[in-house]
Amino acid sequence: MARLAAFDMDGTLLMPDHHLGEKTLSTLARLRERDITLTFATGRHALEMQHILGALSLDAYLITGNGTRVHSLEGELLHRDDLPADVAELVLYQQWDTRASMHIFNDDGWFTGKEIPALLQAFVYSGFRYQIIDVKKMPLGSVTKICFCGDHDDLTRLQIQLYEALGERAHLCFSATDCLEVLPVGCNKGAALTVLTQHLGLSLRDCMAFGDAMNDREMLGSVGSGFIMGNAMPQLRAELPHLPVIGHCRNQAVSHYLTHWLDYPHLPYSPE
């Protein structure tokens, strides 16, 4: 039996309205009763996730910022990874041919250059929000990641520009079809989960994980049991064709699968 369960949030554990369903919360509690370690592995900020855990009284480890930070149950920082200052400077100061909005993250929060109220819909559950700044005056030290949000085709063209400018000095990935992230080299949820399992004296074979986007690829591909959401990005399913696909996040599919796993571990599972 798995000893640790790692969950992506958006498109996986969260429903399309960006809330955690009651069935999901009940199932997470059942996992804790079985002494299975919970880990939330997300692109969201540690400040937001710590607020959510506190509101729900959930004991869980946190992998946040797509692997840039790992925190213990008590909130102790176990691992950090930042963009090199010269990489952050290039991304912030370069004139990119894109309509996408730019978002910068550090330990103090989420920063952007103008109001984009539509983006806050994804944060109704926690109330977390951006701070408006002049991005050219952003301190370059300790930037965890930089994101671009916009149309997928536009972001795909931007990805080419970024790679041509940065080469191997950063890791580029789509955390959603409308979000392209610039991360430190070697930084991803899978690498962060490796750090956490070593801290806990576990192996990746002891873990199960659930996800829906390309920022989940390394995590899903490295654990003993990886599961892809039915609403996942097609690119993820193509990258990991050997992994089972469960149901849609709107139906709380993670809870559906785990309830079966807890109650009928020896019977085959169907997402229907």
UniProtKB/Swiss-Prot annotation:
Molecular-function GO term, any one: magnesium ion binding
Gene: cof
Protein name per its UniProtKB record: HMP-PP phosphatase
UniProt organism field: Escherichia coli O1:K1 / APEC
SS bonds (residue pairs): none
SUPFAM superfamilies (UniProt xref): HAD-like
Family the entry assigns: Belongs to the HAD-like hydrolase superfamily. Cof family.
NCBIfam families: Cof-subfamily, HAD-SF-IIB, PRK15126.1
EC class name: hydrolase
Superkingdom of the organism of origin: Bacteria
Active site residues according to the UniProt entry: 8
